[in-house]
C-alpha cells in the first residue's frame, strides 16, 4: 500500500460509504472513533502527516462496523486489503 493522498482518499471513502464522518481536529489527543448521539464520527489529529493519517485509519477501520455490501467495488477491495494485510515486521 502506498502512503499518498490517493490512498488516504480511498480510506476516507470507505468510512464515508459506511456512514461515518471523518473529521480532522487540532489538539493533543489520540486519534480514534466514537459514536456521538447515534452519529458515527472518526476524529483524526489534523497535525498528522499523510502517512500518520493513513496508519491511523488502517488501525481504526477493522474496529468499526462496516456493512460490506453497502460499499462500492473499489471500497470493498480497499477493505479487503486492510483486513488481510500482514502486519509489518519490525527489526
Predicted feature residues:
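Charged, low-complexity surface segments at secondary-structure and domain boundaries
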Residues: 1, 61-64
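Secondary-structure boundary/capping motif
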Residues: 3, 52-53
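Short amphipathic alpha-helical patches
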Residues: 13, 34-42, 80-88
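Short alpha-helix carrying the canonical HExxH Zn2+-binding catalytic motif
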Residues: 53-62
